[in-house]
Amino acid sequence: MSLVETVRNTLVPVHKEGYRFIAIFFVVSLILGLLWEPLMWIGFLLTAWCAYFFRDPERMTPIDEDLVISPADGRVSSIATVTPPEELGLGSEPMLRISVFMNVFDCHVNRAPMSGTVRRIAYRAGSFLNAELDKASHDNERNGLVVETSHGAIGVVQIAGLVARRILCWTTENASLEGGERFGLIRFGSRVDVFLPEGAQPRVSVGQKAVAGETVIAEFGSSKGPLISRRA
């Protein structure tokens, strides 16, 4: 293996959405260095943090249509049975909601929790409350996806937080998504809610760490044995 290949395999890729921010941090660091050298080194540390924030590592996603995979890196902040947001069009019957909160040190690339077809994308403007608060699901700016899966329609909602002020969603209505596939990103601290129909059983606990594209957060039916994974 060549040196270039070794470095490429060792370093975690940075998502292209972060290039502009990294460049801004770097240039500002150089300018600050002209005023006072220690400021430049502080700026370089912040530049390194920015690159770390926008990291986009590969993940090994379990292949099983009965499994629901975490859509985000972070901490499971809530597991509850609630009425889904009206804009999703999922009806008024309560659904299982599993929430994953991302702090500013978590990877913020969002991934599809199940394979299926995107039937609806609904954006709603709102506040920028702390995303860990339960009322953030209703009050904060959010972008919701309805994905038709083999177990029925599920909802995936990207929620802006106290620091996050930009929700990005790259998929489109009628597009097909594979479980673990990247579909969006939220900048600088946020939350993702997954709404699941009857039959889904949670496989995580509140406070547990979840890894996007890898951690099984819920399941339809019972486990059938060893998992098979694919790189995503």
Swiss-Prot record:
Pathway: Phospholipid metabolism; phosphatidylethanolamine biosynthesis; phosphatidylethanolamine from CDP-diacylglycerol: step 2/2. Heterodimer of a large membrane-associated beta subunit and a small pyruvoyl-containing alpha subunit. It catalyses: a 1,2-diacyl-sn-glycero-3-phospho-L-serine + H(+) = a 1,2-diacyl-sn-glycero-3-phosphoethanolamine + CO2. It comes from the Bacteria. The active site is at S190 (schiff-base intermediate with substrate). It is an enzyme of class 4 (lyase). Catalyzes the formation of phosphatidylethanolamine (PtdEtn) from phosphatidylserine (PtdSer). Is synthesized initially as an inactive proenzyme. Formation of the active enzyme involves a self-maturation process in which the active site pyruvoyl group is generated from an internal serine residue via an autocatalytic post-translational modification. Two non-identical subunits are generated from the proenzyme in this reaction, and the pyruvate is formed at the N-terminus of the alpha chain, which is derived from the carboxyl end of the proenzyme. This is Phosphatidylserine decarboxylase proenzyme. Binds 1 pyruvoyl group covalently per subunit. Its EC number is 4.1.1.65. InterPro entries: PS_Dcarbxylase, PSD-A. Keywords: Cell membrane, Decarboxylase, Lipid biosynthesis, Lipid metabolism, Lyase, Membrane, Phospholipid biosynthesis, Phospholipid metabolism, Pyruvate, Zymogen. One of its GO terms (cellular component) is plasma membrane. Pfam families: PS_Dcarbxylase. It is a peripheral membrane protein. The record marks G189, S190 as: Cleavage (non-hydrolytic). It is found in: Cell membrane. One of its GO terms (biological process) is phosphatidylethanolamine biosynthetic process.
